[in-house]
Amino acid sequence: IAAPRVLDLCAGTGCLGLGIKRFCPAAQVTCVEKSPEAFVYLEKNCRCALKGQGGQTEDLLEPAAFEQEAAPAFDWGPALNALRAKAKPAYAVQPVEGDLFTYWQGLPEGQLDLIVSNPPYLTAEEMRHLQPEVAQEPAMALEAGKDGLVFYRALAEHYQNALRPGGALVLEIGWQQRQAVAALLAANGWADIECRKDFGGNDRCMISHRPEK
């Protein structure tokens, strides 16, 4: 597919979506994030990435890049500056402030080639025993209900129709969640379910597809 249509859910600051755009510049990528705090950085990263398209992406978290991107090249005058302030900014990847649990309701059927997501996946019990460095992260980015599966359940149940036949769903998972997530996908009719390991040898990525027929 020359220009795949990609949706990144629970995008955070845009690592997955921007990474896809980096390696496939023709991709049409939308990143969806619920957290207002994270969305600020998602917007900035998507805008800054314009400078680095075509395999030259700069450090997207470099504060100086934000300052340089935000500064006008010259004074357009009061009238034009006011219009520019209201204009929709240009993005390499389209950021959307939205909720994974409801965003599917507005998606047309069969229009996406790929959905990716690195959702929260810690259980309530795991949240009570976090390592100190992890405990500093926002709970919203970590917690996924009593069983750690609430996001995977929503993805498995509601997002298949948004993909074209044969389109792929790629999910990061916790190292102990392979069987549970695979079962959710199978129960909802996903095809060609497989798991990939990370460099540490742990189960880390579930891949599945909308059936061709």
Q: What does each of the following model-derived ranges do?
A:
Residues 1-62, 66, 70-117, 122-127:
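Conserved SAM/SAH cofactor-binding pocket of Class I
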Residues 146-209:
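Conserved Class I SAM-dependent methyltransferase catalytic core
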Residues 121, 209-212:
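C-terminal beta-strand of the catalytic ATP-binding
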Residues 22, 106-107, 134, 161, ...:
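Structural motif
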Residues 121-150:
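Mobile active-site "lid"/loop adjacent to the S-adenosyl-L-methionine
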Residues 118, 134, 155:
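Conserved RecA-like P-loop NTPase ATPase core
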Residues 100-102, 199-200, 212:
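Residue-level detector of flexible, active-site-proximal loop/helix-junction positions
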